């Protein structure tokens, strides 16, 4: 019994491809609603990791033996897959990193250090994850620059007019989250980028939450930098990418020094390798990066549009079902969202909700979601967050609702 | 909660009580109930210096010494943590500082609440135990200066 309107979308068949979903937790079937933290991995991704280590493990780019050639080819195949996935014009613009956090730190440490001066302004929004606050704070402190924060509405939406007022010729960089990890709200990044460019600023987009749900076309967005993590899109942890416009990347100094990123080294002077290798010092995370391709291929084989239809349906079903619970308030209840629902319940601490749901086999995230300033702004100490993926079902949402009723009863 | 009882005796009593529960619901409902019954911490002590901050919940604790015994009062914004804190107070309050410092605090394992001491919980419970022992050490040094 297919549950969504997407033709051919059989969520039950899909679930079978994720070995972990067969697991039981404390005598209950596992209900995994912490996908915004990390998603589960399909068998093809797990198999790709095992296959790499069992058949062609080798260091890449340097060896001339067969294993090295195979590993290099697979690694570079991921780069091409990522290029297409995010709509970059060339593979030189795709830098592999450990993930979104490292991508942002790469930009703050290289482009930032070379381009930000005392008195310059960097704009972020209230919705940012700590990963898109702290690197800029560190840079601003080092350079004597100023960090400006775009306010949000009571519901959590980016206030565009306030952003426009913050823009000036002092603005050198705007770094904003595409979709909020804590609330799921999608920012109007295209409009933000256009306005920022008019003011002469460079724009970085934190795509950690958006890349798995939304169609990403960095050329259409016209962003200067875009970052995402593999593990949030059904791929392995410890890998991800930074997209940067070629001209910017070429002008930027390297990040880490070491092997791979060099052309020639003498004790007097080192010349750096070409893009993208200039930013990939040392032996990279080969296995996980190779397996990331399998995750992206997996998403593409189902179709982002189909996944989105399914997830949107889960999101509205969950939002409506949860809002019907007495004393429960959904935070960030707006129209343009990825499949994340964040809520508070009167008189019950999120940690208690999380512990009591865990005992029923339901994994949600509780706390501040690495967005302490946002939580302060919403005037809550934290929320409970359920975030949905391609394999979640309405029945699981029913279990969550039932679970919350039980929490309320136990806490009463 | 007689002063005469040792930490080991009180811990054994708690383990005994918990052995009666055959479902997780009963166990947690008992802990929640303990949390609700914890005498409130005087507002004068509910200040930043007395905060033991976990990632998700906060515990406030104050200690005092009377007749060579250390006494604790505490509060938390999360109820399950508050219940566990109440058990810690039951075990430690009214004991000589020396006994608190040396107590292994095994009962949390024995009642199946080990996960609350785990790093991921960041509930502040682990930090709470550490702070209770540090306070006991401070009182011990104050009472009998070397």
Give the role of each language-model region.
Chain B
Residues 4-14, 20-58, 65-66, 106-143:
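N-terminal intrinsically disordered, cationic/polar leader segments
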Residues 53-54, 76-80:
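Secondary-structure capping and boundary motifs in well-ordered enzyme cores
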Residues 2-5, 75-77:
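A short, ordered amphipathic alpha-helix with a cationic face
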Residues 15, 72, 76, 116:
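Conserved short-loop catalytic and cofactor-binding motifs
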Residues 62-78, 89-92:
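Conserved interaction-surface patches within small, structured recognition/assembly domains
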Residues 94-111:
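Glycine-rich phosphate/pyrophosphate-binding loops
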Residues 81-86:
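Short Cys/His-based metal-binding microdomains
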